[in-house]
Amino acid sequence: MSDTKSNAMWGGRFAAGPDAIMEAINASIGFDRRLARQDIDGSRAHAAMLAQQGILSSKDAEAIREGLLTVLSEIETGQFAFSAALEDIHMNVEARLKELIGEPAGRLHTGRSRNDQVATDFKLWVRDQLDAADAGLLALLRALLAQAEAGADWVMPGFTHLQTAQPVTWGHHMMAYVEMFARDRGRMQDARARMNECPLGAAALAGTSFPLDRDATAQALGFDRPAANSLDAVSDRDFALEFLAAASICAMHLSRMAEELVIWSSAQFRFVTLSDRFSTGSSIMPQKKNPDAAELIRAKIGRIVGANVALLTVMKGLPLAYSKDMQEDKEQVFDAADTLMLALAAMEGMVRDMTANRASLEDAAASGFSTATDLADWLVRELNLPFRDAHHVTGTLVAMAEAKGCDLPDLSLAEMQSVHGAIRADVFEVLGVHNSVASRTSYGGTAPSQVRAQVARWKERLG
């Protein structure tokens, strides 16, 4: 342990300085320096409010404002010397401000604690990330809509259990992802609206005796209102957890689509050709074109889900109000946000540049007994069979075709009638994949008319 008296800004109560190991475990400047702009924005708003309330002289407020702008410039240009001994971004900024303007720097913290300061900084940062995610999702949605519009009537197999189920259209499949990512965007927007309450002025946990105007600082920082309970304001990390939860669901959707692109771009499927710009090669096999962007999205998603679980685990046992455990909130969120933004950008680029191979899609749709359900529906509609009986007849015909090595449309009428004598020649009309998708005109169905209507609706909604 150090024998010298602590010179930390909180060191008045301590007779000795912290051990080097204590300094190492306590310091967060290695990562929370990312909050520099938000920290300085919050301090500028706080100083302006203190002056407005007569707590700080206008002269001191101006010196603080100018000094903070200088500090921000030094940080943004790489000239700022961060110190681990000063623990965090708040103390680093304040110490440098004191070097620049002297005694007025010590007045900035009036009516404020690092507890409400960091909660405000972190909220501002997460809010910025929600806005960035919204922009990334919007770009991805527009890329998906372009694919859907181009392939509204391109028939492809729809799958369950990764086995051919029913024919759908390329546009319909793309629109499924539009719906997913639009929900993700809605979750991000909901989280942003809910978190837009300002903790600044809550002080350590109980509020302050200084006559602060918390509405003024909230407005200056773009919040809707000040947080209503000072204890909750400094204890709350729901905003970070909501961001991580929304990011985790979005990440899961990105991973599902990445998985499909990996499969679809394989030589065994050939459904899509990925752009060279989002593929890599092999160091030994010259023929290889690997879907590495999609594979890396699929892999990186675990970091986002892991961050969500990690922060839940940090917060689950904490009494109110602040505990040092909460310092561990930021690295998880920083990494998750970085990963999400990169994954969104990579997916948008892949979707924008990829080419759907229409011939391969339609060839695959025409195999695998994809119109078996259409046959069963025809038996119900035209022959008035109960669906379970129609299901059995169709299954028998599928087994017959499978034994012959052909598909349902390749069976003769006589072969079909050997299973059910009332089957007529017009049954073959429903066995074509184009007729199948065209018939699915229910709202939200795969019929090209429905797909085009959904594309138009979403284009209008997104602007």
From Swiss-Prot:
Q: Which GO terms describe its molecular function?
A: argininosuccinate lyase activity
Print the keywords alphabetically: Amino-acid biosynthesis, Arginine biosynthesis, Cytoplasm, Lyase
Q: Which InterPro entries match?
A: Arg_succ_lyase_C (IPR029419), Argininosuccinate_lyase (IPR009049), Fumarase/histidase_N (IPR024083), Fumarate_lyase_CS (IPR020557), Fumarate_lyase_fam (IPR000362), Fumarate_lyase_N (IPR022761), L-Aspartase-like (IPR008948)
| One GO CC annotation | cytosol
Q: Name one Pfam family in it.
A: Lyase_1
Q: What EC designation does it have?
A: 4.3.2.1
UniProt-listed GO biological process terms: arginine biosynthetic process via ornithine; L-arginine biosynthetic process
Q: Where in the cell is it found?
A: Cytoplasm
Q: Where are the transmembrane segments?
A: none
Gene3D superfamilies cross-referenced by the UniProt entry: Fumarase/aspartase (C-terminal domain) (1.10.40.30), Fumarase/aspartase (Central domain) (1.20.200.10), Fumarase/aspartase (N-terminal domain) (1.10.275.10)
What reaction does this catalyse?
A: 2-(N(omega)-L-arginino)succinate = fumarate + L-arginine
Pathway the protein takes part in: Amino-acid biosynthesis; L-arginine biosynthesis; L-arginine from L-ornithine and carbamoyl phosphate: step 3/3
Signal sequence bounds: none
Record-stated family: Belongs to the lyase 1 family. Argininosuccinate lyase subfamily.
Q: What is this protein called?
A: Argininosuccinate lyase
Q: Quote the gene name from the UniProt entry.
A: argH
